[in-house]
Amino acid sequence: MDQKDCSHFFYRPECPDINNLRALSISNRWLESDFIIEDDYQYLDCLTEDELIFYRFIFTFLSAADDLVNVNLGSLTQLFSQKDIHHYYIEQECIEVVHARVYSQIQLMLFRGDESLRVQYVNVTINNPSIQQKVQWLEEKVRDNPSVAEKYILMILIEGIFFVSSFAAIAYLRNNGLFVVTCQFNDLISRDEAIHTSASCCIYNNYVPEKPAITRIHQLFSEAVEIECAFLKSHAPKTRLVNVDAITQYVKFSADRLLSAINVPKLFNTPPPDSDFPLAFMIADKNTNFFERHSTSYAGTVINDL
């Protein structure tokens, strides 16, 4: 074998920025067993039937989407030779497994532990047009333009846009003193996704050549935001719990944050959310403990674009 190829057989630091994000993720690992989801059963009777249906739908989507992310991670890893990037994605896959297990716990809780009822619901709901629109849009974009750069834009949109309204809708439960454990899990998952979107933006900026035209990036962001807002509006109940207008504005604000992170001009110029928005604290650069109700400190500082 040529001597220049021998580096394949040992680890050599090449991407200090990605290595730092991997280290941050490792230092903040948590498990689905850290909280007891059974504590949230008491809140089920506090929801109206429409609200219960809404949150069942949200967690059906999140559970399915988490699997979609894991599938995409495997394909993205193959695009790079740097071991730091490979190692980062292995770490992210481990975290996504925890997310999937948590979503399963919460989903079953929303069906009062009735597994057969959960299966019946998911079999029908997974084909809901609002969910399928996201999946089909992604599949179409990957099929039409399989460039590495555009795949990364799509990954940024999956992690940074297609989860936003769901995270916000769950966070509104906290504002109403409901589902304390579910909200704790939501805090941790959304903060993990902050690291994931940061990593995707970092890899796109520093390790992906030949970026798409700004007009193309704006087109993809515009379509993704439109789909995400329609997703929320199609199922959000008329309820005291969720402010649909505030969430749709937050989706647009998040899109602008992500565009800025990849050095592309903003598209929506939407102002930041009001101080009472349940995810507003996540856009601040905080040095406080991310695990506010957890005994393990969440190390480091992450600015969340979600």
Swiss-Prot record:
Instruction: Give the matching CDD domains.
Output: RNRR2
Could you say which residues bind Fe cation 1 here?
D66, E96, H99
- Cofactor(s) the record lists: Fe cation
Q: Where in the cell is it found?
A: Host membrane
Q: Which reaction does it catalyse?
A: a 2'-deoxyribonucleoside 5'-diphosphate + [thioredoxin]-disulfide + H2O = a ribonucleoside 5'-diphosphate + [thioredoxin]-dithiol
Q: What class of enzyme is it?
A: oxidoreductase
Gene Ontology biological-process annotations: deoxyribonucleotide biosynthetic process; DNA replication; release from viral latency
Active site annotation, chain numbering: Y103
Entry membrane topology: Single-pass membrane protein
The UniProt annotation places Fe cation 2 binding at E96, E159, E193, H196
A GO molecular function annotation here is: ribonucleoside-diphosphate reductase activity, thioredoxin disulfide as acceptor
| Keywords for the protein's UniProt record, in alphabetical order | DNA replication, Host membrane, Iron, Membrane, Metal-binding, Oxidoreductase, Transmembrane, Transmembrane helix, Viral latency, Viral reactivation from latency
Give me the segments passing through the membrane. 153-173
Q: Which InterPro entries match?
A: Ferritin-like_SF, HSV_RIR2, RNR-like, RNR_small, RNR_small_AS, RNR_small_fam
What GO cellular component entries does it have? Answer: host cell membrane; membrane
Which EC numbers does the record give?
1.17.4.1
User: Which HAMAP family would you find in this protein's record?
Assistant: HSV_RIR2
Known partners and oligomeric status: Heterotetramer composed of a homodimer of the large subunit (R1) and a homodimer of the small subunit (R2). Larger multisubunit protein complex are also active, composed of (R1)n(R2)n.
Which purpose does this protein serve, as stated in its record? Ribonucleoside-diphosphate reductase holoenzyme provides the precursors necessary for viral DNA synthesis. Allows virus growth in non-dividing cells, as well as reactivation from latency in infected hosts. Catalyzes the biosynthesis of deoxyribonucleotides from the corresponding ribonucleotides.
Q: Which family does it belong to?
A: Belongs to the ribonucleoside diphosphate reductase small chain family.
Spell out the protein name for this chain.
Ribonucleoside-diphosphate reductase small subunit
From what organism does this protein derive?
Varicella-zoster virus (strain Dumas)
Q: What is the lineage of its organism?
A: Viruses, Duplodnaviria, Heunggongvirae, Peploviricota, Herviviricetes
